[in-house]
């Protein structure tokens, strides 16, 4: 048990950052043990307390050698500290920076991830964000562990969350995008996409605009590996990527698949992890915090610049191109293209949205810019986001009124609109809370869980101290 106070730790190096805060490599001062510490700003994250609480709950209730170990949490000032196991090998996404992985390495990693998923699914827990960036490695033991439970769900007490639009678009199961009730099989789909990601260096459709990906996944046939991969590997992927979630193999069943049964030991991947002179990756590759799915909207605010960032630090505004270095012979599938019709007959506002969805480039719309400039500097980003979401919703509604849309186009738009509304459902209340005086004192009047009450009480104490000092 590690001490639960900030003075007991020395922060050594930033490992990653995301929507909630920062992850540090840290040393416990007495024992000298190296751990990872996730710091979350409770002032900026107060509206997301449910997600923060969910991660703490999930981690504290896991006891598996293939899941990152949780050591405890405490509040210091306005910051929540979550103490976790540190993995010195970084992430699989970091490993992919040096090239695509061969099937031997992939089978080992997949087997270890399946052990973790089999454990979670046995407790009716869904991870909901399986991808290479959330699979961490140990360079000393070769151990492989699942991390980042910020969007995980407990099926037994979170039925409503099974309809929630969460995760990362490229790895999302069709039923998640379509907002139908989903379960453990959603993780299996993401695992299949991750298998392709490790084989090709990038996930399927990685060069497409994320909005376009959301359209395509439910409407298209599942991705497949090229024929030059082994039949057993291709069959494994197909067992994961069935459009019907009921037809996907379970984690327990996949552990018996020939591709997994033939995998070597975790020690076989250590040589890759210890080649520091080749700079396979460093601590900065351990990105255990990722932007949430709401950041899919970022391309509407900033231009997309392909190829200038790594997929591990994905924020839905850049994408990593395939590395030419190959650790095993593989090839990258060509992008599929969505055709469009009657563009010139559509109103300019509709053509703007269509261009955004159907292309890999996006620029800010004047409506968003003009409205955001009217707000104060404190609320500028929120106002801009509010304006853009309002604009997108009204534009989609206008597009649906166009009688020249084909049945397929109309179905795609309706599916997208439903998903978008889900993303936007809490925006209005958050906007009102941000501009209402003392909103945080009224934000959580409903009954709080023990963790939520602890954080809220600590916040009130610090607020009172601040008022006393200023008074």
Swiss-Prot record:
Cystine pairings recorded for this chain: none
GO annotations of cellular component type: cytoplasm; cytosol; mitotic spindle pole body; new mitotic spindle pole body; nucleus
Active-site residues, record numbering mapped to chain: 129 (proton acceptor)
Annotated binding of ATP, by residue: 15-23, 38
Domain of life of the source: Eukaryota
Keywords: ATP-binding, Cell cycle, Cell division, Cytoplasm, Cytoskeleton, Kinase, Mitosis, Nucleotide-binding, Serine/threonine-protein kinase, Transferase
One BP annotation, GO: intracellular signal transduction
Pfam families for this protein: Pkinase
EC top class named in words: transferase
Catalytic reaction(s) noted: L-seryl-[protein] + ATP = O-phospho-L-seryl-[protein] + ADP + H(+); L-threonyl-[protein] + ATP = O-phospho-L-threonyl-[protein] + ADP + H(+)
Protein kinase domain span: 9-260
Cellular localization per UniProt: Cytoplasm, Cytoskeleton, Microtubule organizing center, Spindle pole body
Molecular functions (GO terms): ATP binding; protein serine kinase activity; protein serine/threonine kinase activity
Role this protein plays: Has a role in the septation initiation network (SIN) required for cytokinesis.
Oligomeric and partner information: Interacts with cdc14.
Similarity comment: Belongs to the protein kinase superfamily. STE Ser/Thr protein kinase family. STE20 subfamily.
Annotated protein name in UniProt: Serine/threonine-protein kinase sid1
Native source species: Schizosaccharomyces pombe (strain 972 / ATCC 24843)
């Amino acid at each position: 048990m590690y001490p639960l106070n900030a003075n007991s730790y020395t922060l050594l190096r930033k490992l990653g950052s995301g929507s909630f805060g920062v992850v540090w490599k840290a040393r416990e001062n007495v024992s000298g043990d190296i751990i990872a510490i996730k710091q979350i700003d409770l002032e900026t994250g107060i509206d997301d307390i449910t997600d923060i609480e969910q991660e703490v709950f999930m981690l504290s209730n896991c006891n598996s050698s293939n899941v990152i170990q949780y050591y405890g949490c405490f509040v210091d000032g306005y910051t929540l500290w979550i103490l976790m196991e540190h993995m010195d090998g970084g992430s699989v996404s970091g490993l992919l920076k040096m090239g695509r992985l061969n099937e031997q390495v992939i089978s080992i990693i997949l087997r270890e991830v399946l052990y973790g998923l089999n454990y979670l699914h046995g407790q009716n827990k869904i991870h909901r964000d399986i991808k290479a960036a959330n699979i961490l490695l140990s360079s000393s033991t070769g151990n492989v562990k699942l991390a980042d439970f910020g969007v995980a769900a407990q099926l037994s007490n979170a039925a409503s969350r099974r309809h929630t639009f969460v995760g990362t678009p490229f790895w999302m199961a069709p039923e998640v995008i379509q907002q139908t009730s989903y379960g453990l099989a959603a993780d299996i789909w993401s695992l299949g996409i991750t298998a392709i990601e490790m084989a090709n260096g990038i996930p399927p459709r990685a060069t497409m605009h994320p909005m376009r990906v959301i359209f395509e996944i439910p409407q298209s046939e599942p991705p497949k590996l090229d024929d030059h991969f082994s039949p057993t590997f291709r069959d494994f992927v197909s067992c994961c990527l069935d459009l019907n979630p009921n037809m996907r193999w379970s984690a327990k069943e996949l552990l018996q698949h020939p591709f997994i049964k033939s995998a070597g030991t975790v020690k076989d991947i250590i040589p890759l992890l210890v080649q520091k002179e080749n700079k396979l990756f460093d601590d900065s590759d351990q990105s255990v915090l990722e932007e949430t799915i709401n950041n899919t909207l970022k391309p509407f605010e900033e231009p997309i610049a392909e190829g200038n960032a790594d997929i591990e630090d994905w924020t839905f505004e850049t994408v990593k191109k395939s590395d030419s270095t190959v650790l095993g012979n593989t090839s990258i599938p060509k992008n599929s293209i969505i055709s469009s019709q009657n563009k010139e007959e559509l109103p300019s506002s509709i053509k703007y949205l269509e261009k955004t969805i159907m292309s890999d480039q996006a620029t800010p719309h004047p409506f968003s810019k003009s409205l955001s400039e009217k707000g104060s500097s404190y609320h500028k980003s929120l106002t801009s986001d509010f304006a853009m979401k309002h604009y997108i919703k009204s534009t989609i509604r206008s597009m649906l009124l166009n009688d020249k849309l084909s049945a397929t186009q109309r179905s795609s738009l309706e599916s997208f609109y439903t998903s978008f509304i889900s993303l936007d459902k809490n925006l209005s209340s958050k906007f009102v809370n941000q501009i209402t005086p003392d909103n945080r004192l009224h934000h959580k009047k409903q009954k709080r869980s023990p963790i939520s009450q602890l954080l809220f009480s600590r916040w009130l104490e610090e607020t009172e101290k601040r008022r006393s000092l200023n008074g």
